[in-house]
Amino acid sequence: MAENPSLENHRIKSFKNKGRDVETMRRHRNEVTVELRKNKRDEHLLKKRNVPQEESLEDSDVDADFKAQNVTLEAILQNATSDNPVVQLSAVQAARKLLSSDRNPPIDDLIKSGILPILVKCLERDDNPSLQFEAAWALTNIASGTSAQTQAVVQSNAVPLFLRLLRSPHQNVCEQAVWALGNIIGDGPQCRDYVISLGVVKPLLSFISPSIPITFLRNVTWVIVNLCRNKDPPPPMETVQEILPALCVLIYHTDINILVDTVWALSYLTDGGNEQIQMVIDSGVVPFLVPLLSHQEVKVQTAALRAVGNIVTGTDEQTQVVLNCDVLSHFPNLLSHPKEKINKEAVWFLSNITAGNQQQVQAVIDAGLIPMIIHQLAKGDFGTQKEAAWAISNLTISGRKDQVEYLVQQNVIPPFCNLLSVKDSQVVQVVLDGLKNILIMAGDEASTIAEIIEECGGLEKIEVLQQHENEDIYKLAFEIIDQYFSGDDIDEDPCLIPEATQGGTYNFDPTANLQTKEFNF
């Protein structure tokens, strides 16, 4: 933490008209990253998954097969309650095939037909594992639909039976039950906590062993991810404590799908507040997480960057745990990565380091990352520029004079000022805050900073912002103009007033108060 917390907070508040404090500076992923998060979930981590056809039949072939047999929902419903096990299995299988169609499976039609209680009843048939398997598959695909469709499965009292099937001696039945539970848990925190309350965690984790087939382990890991999802509310602390040792084992796995899901699970846990961050740290997984930032697979890097990024939204002490793992050595490559979204996440991470204490700010400087942040400020796409603006502005609050001076020497002001003309009010305010902090920190050298701002076109932009609709912005712009660009400096500085000679003429000293771009605050 800062050497004198009360002094540090006073300094922050004196610099920031908005009273931006450490909590504000350290930013969790918020609405500006919704698109990024959704893209990742769509690409890697679907909350719910439909089980496709086992056979290689096209949908049209399946439909034609049903039509040829004149199979109707009424017939399926009637035959699914038959006393003839062959007829019953065939009917449940027909329902499953309908639900496994890639194109618009008729989930609502089947729910309305009243088949759910029949399928749930089939889960009880320990004497007929094939029937249990087909019924579980059909219910899995119903639960892969909308929230209302998932709720229909839950309300049919299927969950206790799926949990019971986790102890089935037939592996395909176990695996199908795991898949079904994953879809139900993935519906949201209410379903997640309901399934947890019925005791899903221990039997689920018991499947993690060297002998488990890789496809089964992938499903188990995916369900663990869903257990870690959602932070409103986050999963129960006892559940997190149970899951973390399993994640510490799975992070060594050589299968990329399992590794990616494991790291995403950790990223969800670290997104749940400082208490959960501490639990992840205490598990000892961080030293194994950090090296994944340089993994050859981009999807592993992406997940790892999010996980460590969430950790550094915590306290200075929690942030230091990550820094102690030599995390900054991975950032030159991340900041120059061909994928823009990696650049953006990397700069977001660093913005939370520059929101830390002065030693942490110095670590970013010593790692040679400031010029790379400034490059992203100037050349990155807008989302990355926005994160870079936060990184710079945070440094102007947290940093010492010499650290802010270094920032200016790296020519931060021109690209910083360029962002004053964007439409995003938050970015404009962050930049104005940063510029004002630099001017305050410069003290007697403020006129040099003002000159740089004017030469790069920043003054003109600040003048325009005095007419901004946002009250905070126009007040801040006015204050900067009034204090540093008021035009009456000559009246205030006697050194600039020429001395009168005996002949009544004035003698100007050409060396008086000449400003240079080389300066020390």
Swiss-Prot record:
Residues 2-58 form the IBB domain. One of its GO terms (molecular function) is nuclear import signal receptor activity. It is found in: Cytoplasm; Nucleus. The modification N-acetylalanine is found at residue 2. Changing residue 328 to P: In SPG88; loss of interaction with DDX21 and NCBP1; severely decreased interaction with RCC1 and NCBP2; compared to the wild type, the mutant shows increased cytoplasmic levels. Changing residue 415 to L: In SPG88; loss of interaction with RCC1; severely decreased interaction with DDX21 and NCBP1; no effect on interaction with NCBP2. Residues 18-29 have a biased composition (Basic and acidic residues). Residues 1-29 are annotated as: Disordered. The modification Phosphotyrosine is found at residue 484. A motif (Nuclear localization signal) lies at residues 43-52. Residues 306-394 are annotated as: NLS binding site (minor). The keyword Repeat applies. Changing residue 315 to I: In SPG88; decreased interaction with RCC1 and DDX21; no effect on interaction with NCBP1 and NCBP2. Ubiquitous. Highest levels in heart and skeletal muscle. GO terms for cellular component: cytosol; host cell; NLS-dependent protein nuclear import complex; nuclear pore; nucleoplasm; nucleus. PROSITE patterns: ARM_REPEAT, IBB. The keyword Kinase does not apply. Residues 137-229 are annotated as: NLS binding site (major). It comes from the Eukaryota. Keywords: Acetylation, Cytoplasm, Disease variant, Hereditary spastic paraplegia, Host-virus interaction, Neurodegeneration, Nucleus, Phosphoprotein, Protein transport, Repeat, Transport, Viral penetration into host nucleus, Virus entry into host cell. Consists of an N-terminal hydrophilic region, a hydrophobic central region composed of 10 repeats, and a short hydrophilic C-terminus. The N-terminal hydrophilic region contains the importin beta binding domain (IBB domain), which is sufficient for binding importin beta and essential for nuclear protein import. It is linked to Spastic paraplegia 88, autosomal dominant: A form of spastic paraplegia, a neurodegenerative disorder characterized by a slow, gradual, progressive weakness and spasticity of the lower limbs. Rate of progression and the severity of symptoms are quite variable. Initial symptoms may include difficulty with balance, weakness and stiffness in the legs, muscle spasms, and dragging the toes when walking. In some forms of the disorder, bladder symptoms (such as incontinence) may appear, or the weakness and stiffness may spread to other parts of the body. Forms a complex with importin subunit beta-1. Interacts with DDX21. Interacts with NCBP1, NCBP2/CBP20 and NCBP3. Interacts with RCC1. Interacts with ZC3H11A. This is Importin subunit alpha-4. The gene is KPNA3.
